[in-house]
Amino acid sequence: MPSVDVEIVNKDENGIGELKVKGPNVMMGYYQNEKATKEVIKDGWFYTGDLAYRDKEGYIFIAGRKKNMIVLKNGKKIFPEEMEDLVNQIDLVEESFVFGMPKGDDLLLSVEIKYNEKVAKEKYPNLNEEEIKKLIWNKVKETNKLLPKYKYIKNMILTKEDFIKTSTQKIKRFEEIKKFI
């Protein structure tokens, strides 16, 4: 973008770091919220909270949000948005929410799935709810094979209920997590 400077800072071993931007069209701060402004504007740079990387051609890709990142005990980082994009491609999945469920001193990578009852009845009319759950779980395990082992989803919760959302229809991640911990 013309007249906008972009940098990726605090990169990990995969080159993923926080995206920061500076320019005349970048926000100057939060309206009447100096504390929040100081958290994101530093030395004239706006720290977006987006975790990004640059490819060989110089294009920038967003991997996920800093506040949503799941960090395992071994230091491996998981971006739930990446996982949700894959899970949401399963025909029976209406929407999914990936999170780290506490297990001992680590996290168990889990997914809550709202399944599409209409699709289930149309495509699999002879399956009961338990069989639908098993079918979806098998499809999640197939999806796992596309990923490094540390990103494997190891637990699934199936629901018919809508997720708790903001007015802009984003999942309230921390509210959803409270249901399980």
Go through each PLM region and give its residues:
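Short aromatic/basic micro-patch
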Residues: 20-21, 31, 77, 157, ...
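AMP-binding/adenylate-forming catalytic core of the ANL superfamily
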Residues: 23, 28-29, 51-147
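Ser/Thr-glycine-rich phosphate-binding loops at phosphate-binding pockets of nucleotides
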Residues: 48, 73, 166-168
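Conserved C-terminal "lid"/linker of ANL adenylate-forming enzymes
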Residues: 97-99, 137-181
